[in-house]
């Protein structure tokens, strides 16, 4: 029986590519333009961010070796802090997974408008986005092996322009172009680096992907930690080398208004054909990451449903172990949100929802850091000082990211937390038919 289950699971390389693909997603292709508002000094922001992201990846790597349970942050929060925080973590992360997909598919299909101008029509764009979302829902239903293969191909295609610019872009790199825009933010050095962090801190969302998908990974105790750290390192190298090279290729004034920095850099170096290839690869990278995030939405909901913290329908699986009903529900919700974002006013509001959903992932990150301090207590051995330092750095990384968010985004995130509290009480009453034990003794830990 176990061998049949393992046959549907995936190995180290596909999981590592899923992590790096989920991290880079669509954002990497717009990063140079976003960072151009600060200038070349952004390299310092990258160094700070990479230290924080690596610390967070090491937190997840250690947690997955201590507890290889599927569900990632949800499983850790539930084990260490009880069902309430487990429920809260799962709802936040589940929402973030599929809401983020809606923003990502619009960007990915938008790149395809380079080849099919009709996609610039709002109705055609929306219908195409819905079709693409359902393609990835159906691929997930086929099984995790299928979706990780698709994402592996998509990630490799996305890496073509990124690695190409990171390696060969330096032949067109001009030091004077880079240094002429060293700090164009109008702020002092510290302020400029802080403004950079507001962009770069978000660039590593997805570091937890392997631990959430542990239930479909072969030998998770070994492969999940390696895939987590490996995926972050791949993303970090690609980010720094490619964005720095582009900042030395394209003058700052042009880069700040560029809608396709990688495409512009490729056209500058090799002509229009190269620009078209980059647009295709960017679309493949964006759309390919949809598969991984849809898989995570299904797996985190299934893990909670198995524990009774999500409706039982999310735990129903097919022969491949895929939570079919949960994925179909996610598909319906994504379709509704996709159509609701067609009008200009709704699109503006959805932009806020997308930003809030990113903050949703930071709360599970913070809980995972705290969980490592509890679960690792007495198990770190001589490495205890190192893991305390790593956890502290990861804490600071997450908190700094929240501080850099807008006040409106933080407010709505807090409102969501309050709503989840009420939902937890209703869910408790659904599961427990007997009266609440008023005389139950208070546990002394």
Swiss-Prot record:
This is Arginine/agmatine antiporter. Induction: Maximum induction requires anaerobiosis, acidic conditions and tyrosine. Belongs to the amino acid-polyamine-organocation (APC) superfamily. Basic amino acid/polyamine antiporter (APA) (TC 2.A.3.2) family. The record marks 293 as: Middle gate. L-arginine binds at residues 23, 26, 96, 202, 205, 357. The record marks 202 as: Periplasmic (proximal) gate. It is found in: Cell inner membrane. It comes from Salmonella typhimurium (strain LT2 / SGSC1412 / ATCC 700720). The chain crosses the membrane at residues 12-24, 42-61, 84-109, 125-142, 145-167, 193-204, 224-243, 277-301, 326-342, 350-373, 385-404, 409-427. Residues 25-41, 110-124, 168-192, 244-276, 343-349, 405-408 are periplasmic. Its main location: membrane. One of its GO terms (biological process) is amino acid transport. Disulfide bonds: none annotated.
């Amino acid at each position: 029986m176990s061998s049949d289950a393992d046959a549907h699971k995936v190995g180290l390389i596909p999981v590592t590519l899923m992590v790096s693909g989920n991290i880079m997603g669509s954002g990497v292709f717009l990063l140079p333009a976003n960072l151009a508002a600060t200038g070349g000094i952004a390299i310092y922001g990258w160094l700070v961010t990479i230290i924080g992201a690596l610390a967070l990846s090491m937190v997840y790597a250690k947690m997955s070796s201590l507890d290889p349970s599927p569900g990632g942050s949800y499983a850790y929060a539930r084990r260490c802090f009880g069902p309430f925080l487990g429920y809260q973590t799962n709802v936040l992360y589940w929402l973030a997974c599929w809401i983020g997909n809606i923003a990502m598919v619009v960007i990915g299909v938008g790149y395809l408008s380079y080849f099919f101008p009709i996609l610039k029509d709002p109705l055609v764009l929306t219908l195409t986005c819905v079709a693409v979302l359902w393609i990835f829902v159906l691929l997930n239903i086929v099984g995790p092996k299928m979706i990780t293969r698709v994402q592996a191909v998509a990630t490799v295609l996305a890496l073509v322009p990124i690695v190409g610019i990171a390696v060969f872009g330096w032949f067109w790199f001009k030091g004077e172009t880079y240094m002429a825009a060293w700090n164009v933010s109008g702020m002092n050095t510290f302020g400029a680096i802080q403004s950079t962090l507001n962009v770069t801190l978000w660039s590593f969302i997805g570091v937890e992907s392997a631990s959430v998908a542990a239930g479909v990974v072969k030998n998770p105790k070994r492969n999940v930690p390696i895939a987590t750290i490996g995926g972050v390192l791949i993303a970090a190298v690609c980010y720094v080398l490619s964005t720095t090279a582009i900042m030395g290729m394209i003058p700052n004034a042009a880069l700040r208004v560029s809608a396709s920095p990688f495409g512009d850099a490729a056209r500058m170096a090799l002509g229009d054909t190269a620009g078209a290839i980059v647009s295709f690869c960017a679309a493949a990278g964006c759309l390919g990451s949809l598969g991984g995030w849809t898989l995570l939405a299904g797996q985190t909901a299934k893990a909670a449903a198995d524990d009774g913290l999500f409706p039982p329908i999310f735990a129903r699986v097919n022969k491949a172990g895929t939570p079919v009903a949960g994925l179909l529900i996610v598909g319906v919700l994504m379709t509704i949100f996709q159509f609701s974002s067609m009008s200009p006013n709704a699109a503006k509001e959805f932009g806020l929802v997308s930003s809030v959903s990113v903050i949703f992932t930071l709360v599970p990150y913070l809980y995972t850091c705290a969980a490592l301090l509890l679960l690792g207590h007495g198990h770190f051995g001589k490495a205890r000082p190192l893991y305390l330092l790593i956890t502290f750095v990861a804490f600071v990384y997450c908190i700094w990211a929240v501080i850099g968010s807008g006040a409106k985004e933080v407010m709505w995130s807090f409102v969501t937390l309050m709503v989840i509290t009420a939902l937890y009480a209703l869910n408790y009453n659904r599961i427990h038919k007997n009266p609440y034990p008023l005389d139950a003794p208070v546990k002394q830990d």
